[in-house]
Amino acid sequence: MDEILYNDNVMIVNDEETSGDVNNQQLISNETIANIQTRLKQLQVSSDSDLEDYINARKMLIEMLNARKEYIPDVLSSLSVERLKSIDLIVQKLNSCEHSIIEHANILDQLQNEITSLKTENEYIVRLNDINAKKAKLFDDFNAKYEDDVGPLYVYAASEDVRQAAIYLSYMMRMIITFENETIESNFIVSDSLYIGDTILNVTISTDLQLGNRTVNVTMDDISESFVILEREYIELYLTRHVHKILNNTISYSTALVIFKRTVEDISIPSQIVNTVLFQQQISNSVTVKDVSKSLVCDFKIDAETELYILLPTIIPDSYSMDILGNQEFMLYLSDLYAFNLLQEILDVLYIDQLEKGLENEDNRAIEQLTLQNAQSIRYILNTLQYVPLYKPYDILIENGILNSIEYAAPLMYIKNEYISKNITRTSDKYTTDRVIGAHVLSGSNMDSLPNTAFKQKLFMNTQSVLTQENPIYEDTDIIIYAVCVISREYDDTICGSGYTYTTSNMYANRSEFIRMNGCIADSVPVKTSTIVKCTYSLIDANRIGLLYNKTRTNIKINQILICFKNSFAVPTSLNVAMDVKIQCLKKTETLSVTQAKPSQILLENGISYFGIICDISFSSDYVFDGNESINFTLQPNTNISGKKELVMYGRQGGGMQISDMFQHKQDSFEYSIKVGLVCNSTQIGMGQWFEIFSTLIQGEFIGNIDTLRESTIRGISNIYDFTDVREFLHEYKISIVKLSIQCLRAMSAGVQDVIVAYSHALSNIDALILDITVEMNDFSNRLTTLEDKVKDIEKWIQNQIDSQNTTIWGSLLDTFVNLIIATALGYATAGIGVLVTKISVAVLSFTSRALTSIARGLQAAGHKVSTLFKLHITQPFLNGAHSLKLLTQKFNAVQGNLTKYERKYITALELSEANNYAAIAKYLKNLNPEIKLAEAINHKLVYSSRYVNPVFKLGNEVMSTVEINYHGLTAIGKLPQLRTPTKKLLSSDFGTTLMKKNKAPAHAYMVITDVDARSEYDLVTKYILGVSEGFTSTTKHVTAGSFKLQYEFRKHPTTNKTTVSFSTYQDTGYTAEEVKLLFNRYFKNRTNITNANQQWELLSSKFMSLQTSTLNSQRFVLPTSHRTTALYEAFKNTRRFDYNLLTNNCQNFCQDSLNWLENGVINGSLIQHSDQLAIKYVNALRGDLSLI
């Protein structure tokens, strides 16, 4: 069958077998064909319907042309060339449209499937968005009501979503009723939208004037109890409710009313529990869902002095002041705050519930796809988190001791054998014995000069040595513990010894010759090349030799135990360390306890840096050779050594002359024994043993080069006892951990660079560091190579969907996944969230290398964002009720010095009441909220570091360093910074927010760094003031950057507990009177009447002691270590020129760059030109911690 290609790609069949069929089709007229052709010419493809008509007409034409092939020449002959070309173009367009239709049909089918899938999956997305929207609205409503940014506390709004959630909540309300004044009827209403149904708690009071007491009647539902209240007594009521969901959309709950009767001392704070009455009412009946949103109204008809306190399940803002609101307003405020927190927990439960349902659906891919779309933002958060101090509890307890203690090197004597011929000395191998420690002795054999001259000088060749060792004594996956041992020896300037006394007359006659040479004639007989000269020798017994030695003192001190945390990048906080160690060394065994423990960055001798704890102990042991002990030894060759040996020498030619060579070849090895004795009883030196005189033999080996250039009577072996590097010789001493207990908060990294944090960037070899990073990144790359292309395809597809749809649903879920990442990084994720983040990790890790470049910027951006959004701090995260205590003490106007007294009593009362299991509610509910946990993690150290203002709140060594950036208004834009009182606008929160987002505000910025050293007697607070135009500025020709410091001592009175503050003198701080004058003139221009340096220093100290009300204070940042603070201060202690530019390099840039250095150790921007000084000062600061060891 032949095929002829027509110009519109139509195939005309030319087959003889079909001719009959064609003839049967000749009834089709030419007119019909012409009409179809006309239709094709006129047809314009402008719509889907036209296109369909065109296709159908074309198909008909093809069929007819195949049936009427004999008419084709007639049709073509009637068409012009131009028309034929036009038809060709139409046909080409037709073909193109056909291909497009096929492609679009496939795409439309794909999109239809995707839309169908998304329609199903968006069921969960819409719910999650709805919950987030409610949170945002509730937060705005609360702020609008109280005009106070207190954090993510939300008002409840009835929603179908709430009814779908599984709720497991317990909460309580506490009322304190006192009767110190006359009875006045008062009415307090507390609304809690979480209570189900209407429950009335009535508290009424009746007074018996004759008996002088009062009766309190408490009624709730069918419960009715009465209490007789005597003078100085009061009652506490705890109304608790546990709500949980059951099947069929019904809710059951249990209610408990707990009443405590207490007595009052000086003020109305619980001091002890006198009588306790506990009764409960259990309600099991079903309550319909529609009652969820009803609220409880409690009418209290009680005295005006009654105080109502609600124990919040989460937190109370630190910024709250009792002076802002009155008594009744305060009650309402706490009530709202309480309700907002609880409702927020419900929304969080709902949120996690919807996530888990979405993940359980195998066909649901929407959450993963949305996560990939937001991968860049999530990576940014992850990289930021790796420098955020995410604190986690760390706890270790060892009570039975560590049996496998490590044995370490200790200083020992060794014998250095020298063969001496004339004045030529060849040194052989060294031999050791652990029988004597620290002696420096020398025999009298082969002395070339008189005693007490060169002999004495040789004794003093090595008279002083100090060695520091960091010996590991414990290691696991989290920590490694080192004992810092300092080994030293000192020599007296006199020579001691009770052995043989040498004089000029007997020095050579009584030498202890070890090798006797016989018949050596090498220097008297000329020899030719290759002439063999032989010399024989024999071994002889050495005489008994008395030893001389310096009076020597060997001392070993162990003053510090270093507890180093692995993979931690900031110092730990909330320390509670107890440690007992048993040390056996130098005839001394002692068990010691750690006397003090402080957090610090630790730099080991090998250059590796850790963050950890330095523990102080005190151990010292000595041994002294004082001349009262006599040491003797003899040398004796073993009997298996032949009597005579032969040395061979070959002549050689040099310079045209035949000269003889020395016998310097290793000819033989000789074994000999050394008998050592010590005139004393056997005793322990650590785990070593001292032997009695001549009690044992020590095997040694002599391999020496014998010089026989000429015969001489001055031959033999000089045997020297000396002290060598302790690393070469092992001696057993032990440090055993008897008991170890560590409780603290440990800073962990949430990023992907944990392996890098153990390096000291200033000290480690940069090539090795780069290699380690490269290996790590290659590992990531190898694991993700096969996934990266797929991830890119998915991201591209999602982006196309975003571009093609008019919706905000994709972008609105960013916060959702950020919260998930944060929750997982903090370790509080549920199983569902864990699965989700596992799916996310492919997208996150595949872009890790690119995202690393944004770490520095991410730190500040995320740190500020979180700190600003969540102004919530946990004063004591492991102590229930600490915030309530703070508010109580403020409410009752307790004096500052007495806070700790009532603090202890209140805590005791809480502990006694923990039997009802409601005291732990706050801990359980707090763990459900990832935002709160992140805020707590970032601001934890901030809370502790702020205690320097009020040291009575300090509960240990968790006081940390902080830095804050303050702002003053400028006199004129573009001029040098001059301080003035800022306007109200400058102090406004809105302006402050704008100021933190930009670096070009009309304000001068400077830094105040506060470092607190918690000592046993007092707290030493050091403030560093740093910035452009700060410090000792004496000229205005150039802009400079400088720093200075002030110090304060906070002391607590042992009996009154009142705290006093004193200023360190300028002399103790390290300044001169002239420097004080420069500083004073800088900050007190108008106080020219004060010229005394002491008075000037006191005014400067007062100015910077606390926050200045005339400045805008930014959010404080907590510093992981104080070493970079010291480096920054030292670098700018002497003012340095600063190339000031208002737009690109101003005072605010300098502060931000300095902050980046303090927090991250990254030098950029305005600090680059000072990088060498900062690095040097930083290393010196690290080394400084070890200098006192």
Curated annotation (Swiss-Prot):
Active-site residues annotated for this sequence: 1004, 1147
Assigned keywords, A-Z: Capsid protein, Outer capsid protein, Virion
Domain of life: Viruses
Predominant subcellular localization, coarse grouping: virion
Domain PPPDE: start-end pairs: 981-1187
GO cellular component, one term: viral outer capsid
Compartment(s) where it occurs, according to its Swiss-Prot or TrEMBL record: Virion
Gene Ontology MF, one: peptidase activity
Range of residues in the leader sequence: none
Protein name: Putative structural protein VP1
Source species: Aedes pseudoscutellaris reovirus (isolate France) (ApRV)
